[in-house]
Design a protein with these regions (language model features):
Chain A
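Long, hydrophobic alpha-helical segments
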Residues: 49-66
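Transmembrane helix boundary and interhelical loop/hinge segments in multi-pass membrane proteins
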Residues: 13, 62-80
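Aromatic- and glycine-rich beta-strand/loop motifs that create alpha-glucan
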Residues: 1-23
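Junction motif at the cytosolic side of a transmembrane helix
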Residues: 200-216
Length: 216, 242
């Protein structure tokens, strides 16, 4: 594993401030619009807000990974890596960097919002953990979708990848209900972690296969 | 000898010749068989005690929902064959399955909705089976649009096959996860699984219609794959000589 690639990728994304601050701000705007459209002081169950948060993080991580490969594809950087046989590492590090700079900040913004709803600190921290884990899964799959739909627009990528993410959404929804009922979450959480490990170790290979096919 | 047979059969040219000879008779045979099954089911079986005559749509709904999933699995097998052995024919076949699968899945959803109105009192219920079928339908549409969006069809075949393989892993997962989700939210009164065992008088025409429908759909797949071969290999000399 070449550590330099990680630093380069980190630097490249960090320099493009709009690419990682932008999604977080968009997410903040979406979150601000919840209290405007739903009466936050009424007795709506907290689950409603949590499910809104799952769905909006799904969409915002999609926005955040929209340009994950296209710039490097256009200027030939990916081809260089492919020649050096480092494509898998690049894909892996790109996903990691996007998770650190977009996925985790989104999770913390959502955590602040959940705290503001007077939901107990235990449930909020579990939700934070779930968001951090599930954002990695989302980013992996959306990178796959964006690798497939390079130069074709992101609607195609969304259309293809959201069906794959539905099980994750269902597990998240099930977790929130059990958390609010006070049931144990160890089973769901370990399932989510397992899915994360599987996805994060398997999808980069698929993505590098797809990118190699693009470069042929 | 077997190897030689496979090599011959796997070339689009000889497949086309064989399909040209047998495709249409097979399709016609299963079409008539399916019509026969429908006639048997619609006119020669007694009405259901609870559902009356409305249950008779079972002879269209059950084969369609069955095929909706089988076609995806078949598509995954042909895609795997394409990715592993680089057989172009397999890619053509799996590409031509996708639209048929989408139509069959839509038909399953549609007939289910029609059946739901008299029996459940609603045309849609967010339960496990219906939701997973709807996701399946959207997956078919996504695959079709993915294949259509690439000018370079060889690339499109590869992406399509990779995605089908990820999708087929996902199908049981979706089914299972939707099951968990619905067991929490919904009483079991309206699930199809808890229906009492079906009477032989209705079971035999049902089996008959399922078999006939499988044959009918595979006949259609053969015809549609022939079409795809002609489209993709139109610059080859053997196609020009037809």
């Amino acid at each position: 594993m070449d550590r330099d690639i990680l630093y380069i990728e980190m630097y490249k994304l960090f320099k493009r401030r709009r690419a990682w601050i932008g999604p977080v701000l968009v997410f903040l705007l979406i979150i601000i619009s919840f209290p405007l459209t739903l009466d936050i002081n009424s007795d709506n169950p907290p689950q409603i807000y949590l499910s809104f948060i799952w769905i909006s993080t799904l969409l915002v991580t999609m926005l955040g990974t929209e340009l994950i490969f296209s710039d490097d594809f256009e200027d030939g950087t990916l081809e260089q890596y492919a020649v050096n046989d480092q494509l898998i590492e690049v894909v892996f590090y790109k996903i990691l960097v996007h998770w650190v700079l977009i996925g985790i900040p989104l999770a913390f913004v959502a955590f602040l919002f959940i705290l503001s709803l007077n939901i107990s600190i235990q449930i909020s921290s579990i939700a934070l953990l779930c968001l951090i884990i599930s954002n990695l899964i989302f980013i992996n799959f959306f990178s796959l979708g964006n690798a497939l739909s390079l130069k074709k627009g992101s609607i195609l990528g969304l259309l293809i990848t959201i069906p794959f993410l539905i099980p994750v959404l269902i597990v998240l929804g099930k977790m929130t209900t059990s958390a609010l009922l006070g049931l144990s979450l160890v089973g769901h959480l370990s399932l989510l972690v397992g899915v994360m490990i599987l996805v994060a170790s398997f999808i980069p290979f698929v993505i590098s296969f797809i990118l190699r096919t693009h470069l042929e | 000898m077997i190897k030689k047979f496979f090599h011959q059969f796997a070339s689009p040219k000889s497949y086309f010749a064989i399909a040209n000879k047998f495709g249409k008779p097979v399709l016609a045979f299963f079409f008539l068989l399916y019509i026969g099954a429908l006639v048997w089911g619609l006119f020669f079986t007694p009405p259901d005690v609870v559902q009356g005559d409305s249950y008779r749509i079972i002879y269209m709904h059950v084969p369609a929902s069955f095929m909706a999933q089988i076609l995806f699995v078949v598509m995954a097998i042909t895609s795997a064959v394409f990715l592993i052995w680089k057989l172009k024919l397999a890619a053509y076949v799996s590409k031509s399955i996708a639209p048929i699968g989408a139509i069959v899945t839509f038909f399953a959803l549609f007939s289910g909705s029609i059946w739901g109105i008299p029996t459940w009192g609603t045309w849609w219920q967010w339960d496990a089976r219906i939701t997973s079928t709807l996701i399946l339908f959207i997956m078919y549409l996504g695959l079709i649009s993915l294949h259509a969006s690439f000018e370079n069809k060889d690339k499109a075949d590869k992406f399509f096959s990779v995605l089908v393989l990820i999708g087929v892993v996902n199908i049981p997962v979706i089914k299972k996860s939707v099951d968990w989700w619905s067991t929490l939210h919904q009483s079991a009164s309206i699930t199809l699984t808890s229906k009492p065992a079906i009477d032989p008088v209705m079971l035999y025409p049902l089996m008959f219609s399922i078999v006939a429908f499988i044959g009918l759909i595979f006949g259609l797949v053969i015809l549609s794959s022939q079409n795809e071969i002609l489209k993709r290999e139109k610059y080859k000399s053997w196609v020009k000589n037809i």
